[in-house]
Amino acid sequence: MQKIVVYVYIYLFVQISVDPVALDGSSQPTENTEKDGLCNACTWRQNTKSSRIEAIKIQILSKLRLEQAPNISRDVIKQLLPKAPPLQELIDQYDVQRDDSSDGSLEDDDYHATTETIITMPTESDFLVQMEGKPKCCFFKFSSKIQYNKVVKAQLWIYLRQVQKPTTVFVQILRLIKPMKDGTRYTGIRSLKLDMNPGNGIWQSIDVKTVLQNWLKQPESNLGIEIKAFDENGRDLAVTFPGPGEDGLNPFLEVRVTDTPKRSRRDFGLDCDEHSTESRCCRYPLTVDFEAFGWDWIIAPKRYKANYCSGECEFVFLQKYPHTHLVHQANPRGSAGPCCTPTKMSPINMLYFNGKEQIIYGKIPAMVVDRCGCS
């Protein structure tokens, strides 16, 4: 229904722009016709921009399968954001936009967003609460988006507090299991020994891909893990439950999953700017600012170039749109006329909090207008 309404508006605008009509039904061109036409075009483009921004907000929530924007304050975000290398890399080296309409970029056919990286923070499980001698950490709940056969990489990141002198640190990651007859409650995942020098604390990553895949295949076996990291004097260096001044130093899981995009068909279109006098269907620049929406739950990008389509699609533009002209010639009565719409769209990468306070790095399809055309 919305598409039909847009088509009607475009059709009416084209008719008014081409042939201004007086109230008595007679055509009355004036010396200001050209100027008025340009003003009308500016007004039309402004309305199109506003509609495009509102549509983008709706599309993002829909494609992320969110009924509403997550209600996460800036203070909470500051506490939840890990001060860790993988997250900082995503933010610092963020590929916000590939605004190159000349190349055959990759894009997905699916409507919903595809997930590439999920950063999961630890929670407390019932099993850990019920245990005697409760372990320090950690239990991770996994998103349904993670399938065991799609996991490319799974890293457990832990932060080790600073040391006062050169020392050797012994790190041990244990997987919790249901108590056996001999009382055993743990099985080893990984042990490592590393040397630390005085200075700031460090982040250490441990490969847990195999364990994660087993958990995904058998969810009931996921009872949590315990993290141990001691120096030569028995001092516990692992930050499992952050203390004062340790916000953002929680352990977390970084999981990367496969994403297999398909190549899109290449076509061509016009590019214009806001000062252009081009009347034909054209792509115009539009920057979407998430901070202006109050969408603090989007970590990156804070803004991106979305672009939009606007302009006329008359049948006289034969050289620019030959296919549309041939269709009209074959069936002149069966077509209401072409409309200016996106003919190629590409995805954006986004780093965001979902409703469960998990950090997701994913790809949202069809969010950038690369080319416009008449169809």
UniProtKB/Swiss-Prot annotation:
Residues 1-23 form the signal peptide. GO terms for biological process: muscle cell proliferation; negative regulation of myoblast proliferation; negative regulation of satellite cell differentiation; negative regulation of skeletal muscle satellite cell proliferation. Disulfide bonds join 272-282, 281-340, 309-372, 313-374. One of its GO terms (cellular component) is extracellular space. One of its GO terms (molecular function) is cytokine activity. It is found in: Secreted. The keyword Secreted applies. Keywords: Cleavage on pair of basic residues, Cytokine, Disulfide bond, Glycoprotein, Growth factor, Secreted, Signal. Gene3D superfamilies: 2.60.120.970, Cystine-knot cytokines. Homodimer; disulfide-linked. Acts specifically as a negative regulator of skeletal muscle growth. This is Growth/differentiation factor 8. It comes from Coturnix coturnix. The gene is MSTN.
